[in-house]
Curated annotation (Swiss-Prot):
Role summary: Catalyzes the decarboxylation of 3-octaprenyl-4-hydroxy benzoate to 2-octaprenylphenol, an intermediate step in ubiquinone biosynthesis.
Cofactors that this protein relies on: prenylated FMN; Mn(2+)
Subcellular location field: Cell membrane
Record-linked SUPFAM superfamilies: FMN-binding split barrel, UbiD C-terminal domain-like
A Pfam family per the record: UbiD_C
GO molecular function, one term: metal ion binding
Active site: D322
Main EC class the enzyme belongs to: lyase
Protein name (database record): 3-octaprenyl-4-hydroxybenzoate carboxy-lyase
Length: 522
């Protein structure tokens, strides 16, 4: 189903009972987090906080708080009563589309060639289009009117350093790339028009910024932040879209209609384009540092001094409660100065919180897991299923089910998964099992680990690999180890002993007891 903007999606969710309006006053300082967290853990609806007692904007939370709503946002019309299972299965179709876009199969005949041409035409037809007089610029704040405190920016946890923008789609462009990049990076409010842009070094926005700083030293770097885009654009920004395809174009494929874009209004930022029907847009720059920077506070990490981007204004970010369930360490990141804010009339502020799983990012991880499966299966045909348990912070542990064909096969799959997609670079643990193990059932996974693993033989340890900066368990920030566990049945060459034979009841006996079951009343 097509959703032309966030409001269209909100209306659809309300119609099918997936959204609840909250008229009571709920503060964006801690209270919204507590309420959203309780509702999400109960599998409840999205929440629209309508009271304007504290701010002039309604706040939308828990938008993607269930896999079904993620599927709906991706254009899959999950029917009422189907539950999350049906929605997850339908998301594999999105993965198959991505797989075809990432590595198209060579045509084996006229029929295949026709399908390939149809796909290419579909991608071509979804090229974004620029519109004039966009709704996202119905209201414009400039000069002293630009005050981020006028927005209902959440403070999520008691130990947070301050208010935090959590669902902003950051739009950047590198000097050597034709397409714009969309990324979601949290942004700490530190002044009337200043935010800290927390993007890690490997993320698209940080790479664009670094390339710009190298080629344009001393020049301000333009950035736009979108708050409240249509669901296809939001989800396109968190999906592993091939580098040759823009997130806007992929959003068009999900939506079934071209993404309408608008040029930013601020001179110097007008080379960036944002969704024309977005609720709120922040336009501005990351400016070069003027004068000598103030010294780092006692006990804080040192300021960045290496690289062209170090010459730009930075600030100490955090601590904040994160998706790990802990407060993260402080670190230096660039400062984004907002020069102009544009918005729709009666704009909606879209927000979320992160915390110990399950939270909204964990739900997104469960849904995107199904998108990953076809991508992995195309590269590794032996993989029969793949699961990122949400308890593992969505990506730190992966369980792989495979059809094993030779000794050492499981180890090959481990290294393949670690190296295949950027999304798995930070996966610390991989457990590989056979086809007879349901990888979504912890009881079966633990059974396989405890009965099919010899720790010395079946454990793979890899030291000094890229690791999540937020992973305080690693000895060095951003660098740590990985573990692979081969919980498959062992083949000759992997063991000298006779391997165990699983206990299975006779099929005729099972059928006989099935026929008696209702009579027994057990």
């Amino acid at each position: 189903m097509k959703y032309k903007d966030l409001r269209d999606f909100v209306g659809r969710l309300e119609t099918i009972g997936e959204l609840r309006r909250i008229s009571q006053t709920v503060s964006p300082v801690l209270e919204m987090t507590e309420l959203c967290d309780r509702v999400l853990r109960a599998g409840g609806p999205a929440l629209l906080f309508e009271s304007k007692a504290q701010h002039a904007f309604p706040v939308l939370g828990n938008l993607f708080g269930t896999p079904r709503r993620v599927a709906l946002g991706m254009g899959v019309d999950a029917q009422a009563g189907e539950g999350d299972g049906a929605a997850l299965e339908s998301l594999r179709d999105v993965g198959r589309l991505l797989s075809a876009l990432k590595e198209p199969e060579p045509p084996k005949g006229l029929k295949d060639a026709g399908k390939l041409l149809s796909l290419a035409k579909a991608v071509w037809d979804m090229a974004p289009k620029t519109v004039s007089a966009p709704p996202c610029q119905e209201i414009v704040w400039e000069g002293n009117d630009v005050d981020l405190a006028r927005l209902p920016i959440q403070t999520c946890w008691p130990g947070d350093a301050g208010p935090l923008i959590t669902w902003g789609l950051t739009v950047t462009k590198g000097p050597n790339k034709p397409r714009q990049n969309l990324g979601i990076y949290r942004q700490q409010l530190i002044g009337r028009n200043k935010l800290i842009m927390r993007w890690l070094a490997h993320r698209g926005g940080a790479l664009d910024f670094r390339e710009f700083a190298l080629q344009n030293p001393g020049k301000p770097y333009p950035v736009a932040v979108v708050l409240g885009a249509d669901p296809a654009t939001i989800l396109g920004a968190v999906t592993p879209v091939p580098d040759t395809l823009s997130e806007y174009q992929f959003a068009g494929l999900l939506r079934g209609g071209r993404t309408e874009l608008a040029k930013c209004l601020t001179p110097g930022v007008d080379g960036l384009q944002v969704p024309a029907r977005a609720e709120i847009v922040l336009e501005g720059f990351i400016y070069p540092q003027e004068g000598a920077p103030s010294p780092a506070p006692a006990g804080a990490p040192p300021r960045p001094v290496k690289g062209a981007s170090a010459a730009y204004e930075h600030a100490l970010e955090g601590p904040y409660g994160d998706h790990t369930g802990y407060y993260n360490e402080q670190e230096w990141f660039p400062v984004f100065t907002v020069e102009r804010i544009t918005m729709r009339r009666d704009a909606i502020y879209h927000s979320t919180y992160t915390g110990k799983p399950p939270d909204e990012p964990a739900v997104l991880g469960v849904a995107l897991n199904e998108v990953f499966v076809p991508l992995l299966q195309k590269q590794f045909t032996e993989i029969t299923d793949f699961y990122l348990p949400p308890e593992g912070c969505s990506y730190r542990m992966a369980i792989v089910q495979m059809k094993k064909s030779y000794p050492g096969h499981a180890k090959r799959v481990m290294f393949g998964v670690w190296s295949f997609l950027r999304q798995f670079m930070y996966t610390k643990f991989i457990v590989v099992v056979d086809e007879d193990v349901n990888i979504r059932d912890w009881k079966e996974v633990i059974w396989a680990i405890t009965t099919r693993i010899d720790p010395a033989r079946d454990t793979v340890l890899v030291d000094r690999t890229p690791i999540d900066y937020l992973d305080f368990a690693s000895p060095v920030a951003g660098l740590g180890s990985k573990m692979g566990l081969d919980a498959t049945n062992k083949w000759p060459g992997e063991t000298d002993r006779e391997w165990g034979r699983p206990i299975v009841m006779d099929a005729a006996v099972k059928q006989r007891i099935d026929s008696l079951w209702n009579e027994l009343g057990l």
